[in-house]
Amino acid sequence: MASLRDIKAKITSTKKTSQITKAMEMVSASKLNRAEQNAKSFVPYMEKIQEVVASIAQGSKGINHPMLNARPVKRTGYIVITSDRGLAGGYNSNVLRTVSNVIRERHNMDSNQYSIIVLGRLGRDYLKRRGFNIIDEVVGLSDHPSFTDIKDLASRAIAMFADGAYDELYIYYNHYVSKISQEVTENKILPLTDVASDKPTTAYEFEPSEEEILKVLLPQYAESLVYGALLDGKASEHAARMTAMKSATDNAMEVIDSLTLSFNRARQAAITQEITEIVGGAAALE
């Protein structure tokens, strides 16, 4: 049985750990509130730009733009959103496991058939160690990234599609459902074959021509899809870390309760032993 000193040291150490995890839980909760607001605030912009693009695509005939047209797929691009820091439960492992399985099944790890653009240090390190074909990366993004932070990468990804580096582009990230639930999600970014909507669209008059507007608007729309996924993923990251730290704090408190019970029992046994020895010694003197 552990000594009273050992048990007390474990209690002290566990209490310190619980204080750290509780603080991290509170920090993540604060970051989550802002990340949720950022993600929600971006939705109206994304919906409006999609509405305009859909209006052009549905109302105009004969428009030919490479970002709207599917072509034979010889190579596929993947954008993978992960985090720079861990301690977030299954946030990173879930999306990385999904992407790894998809690439093995679709491409048999043939680097001539796929390319990966990865966001986040943990995702980059994981994929590099396992020999995946990474062609671009971004690390060190803030907890609340601006559009400027991601615009260059999104522009490069779209330019590579236009240049034929790959024939389709998917994005993988954790979609924020609630504070306790996040889902690994796959969205097709390019080509924009599904941009048209069944919903009634507003009639617009375009000046200059629809083709000229699409040259500017389609890249912006594709970039907004990437940025929207990043904001969604950031909310999921903070939620996952908050949940993980709450679980760690709860587990620490259970350990403290168990250790305290063991400490009290050991102390009681020690006191009983001392009393027994005193009584035994007194009896021997009689």
From Swiss-Prot:
InterPro entries for the chain: ATP_synth_F1_ATPase_gsu (IPR035968), ATP_synth_F1_gsu (IPR000131), ATP_synth_F1_gsu_CS (IPR023632)
Sorted UniProt keywords: ATP synthesis, Cell membrane, CF(1), Hydrogen ion transport, Ion transport, Membrane, Transport
Xref: Pfam families: ATP-synt (PF00231)
GO molecular function: ATP binding; proton-transporting ATP synthase activity, rotational mechanism
GO biological process terms held by the UniProt record: proton motive force-driven plasma membrane ATP synthesis
SUPFAM superfamilies associated with the record: ATP synthase (F1-ATPase), gamma subunit (SSF52943)
Source taxon at top rank: Bacteria
GO cellular component, one term: plasma membrane
Topological category with respect to the lipid bilayer: Peripheral membrane protein
Subunit structure: F-type ATPases have 2 components, CF(1) - the catalytic core - and CF(0) - the membrane proton channel. CF(1) has five subunits: alpha(3), beta(3), gamma(1), delta(1), epsilon(1). CF(0) has three main subunits: a, b and c.
Known function: Produces ATP from ADP in the presence of a proton gradient across the membrane. The gamma chain is believed to be important in regulating ATPase activity and the flow of protons through the CF(0) complex.
Similarity annotation: Belongs to the ATPase gamma chain family.
Protein name, per record: ATP synthase gamma chain
Protein source organism: Bacillus cereus (strain G9842)
